[in-house]
Amino acid sequence: MQGAPSPDPAKTRKGRGPGPTPESMEVKDAEILVVKVGTSTLTYENGKVNLRRMEELCRTLSDLQNAGRKLVLVSSGAIGVGMGKLGLLQRPEETEKKQALAAVGQCELMFLYDKFFGEYNHTVAQVLLTADVVDVPRGRENVQNTFRELLSMGVIPVVNENDTVETKELEGKNFGDNDTLSAVVAGLCGAQGLVILTDIDGLYDGDPRKDPGARRMPRVEEITPQIEALAGGAGSNRGTGGMATKLKAAKLAREQGIPTAIVSGAKGETPYRLLEGEDVGTLFPV
């Protein structure tokens, strides 16, 4: 993937085909689970935080943690929340302005996550990453050690790219979007599953916003060029990712032996239904 750190060689799927195998892994079987939530799920069109969805997400993840799973949350939204905080409706083009908005928004995001998770007696930790750190062995090892210690303490890491310190000189050396970041994080923390929450309920064989006959694809065994062509265009005005970046993340996770699910983030019960084996979203098993 252009600009993304290389997968951990120890976790690639060498020797395994694209279809199910006797050792096939599903997201529902994961003990360590990475959940990625996007800006369009966390905020309204005006950029303000969707407190209901955010509270539902924190309650659901807290309950899954109580049930014995270990959770890592990759959260977009710093720039979008910063826009809402400062009353901006249009995402700026200038790198410096986006960095400033990320600095404002990240504070607000972590305040809310600390508040909502704290209501269910869970502690969160902020982890801000840059690609140049995790793409070198020493930096990668340090990040892996941090995740291991946080998870062993029962802490829920909340991860984002450190947009504030990314500069033009580092362009091409960044993650590019938080879908990619979530797949990288899944490899770093030894996850057995990646769940990407988005504003539609999976991958469709057409654009469901334009084609009422478009059908959801419940399961994708191999991410072929034909499958990638279904992903369409860019993301929302408030975020950087669209379905194409989510497919790339699923592909990167698959290369590390990690199954992925792309599901709607609109309802708090959807992760429960997914992990109980119900037919929701689109699954990418390994």
Which residues are covered by each model-predicted region?
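Intrinsic, low-complexity polybasic segments
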Residues: Q2-D8, R16
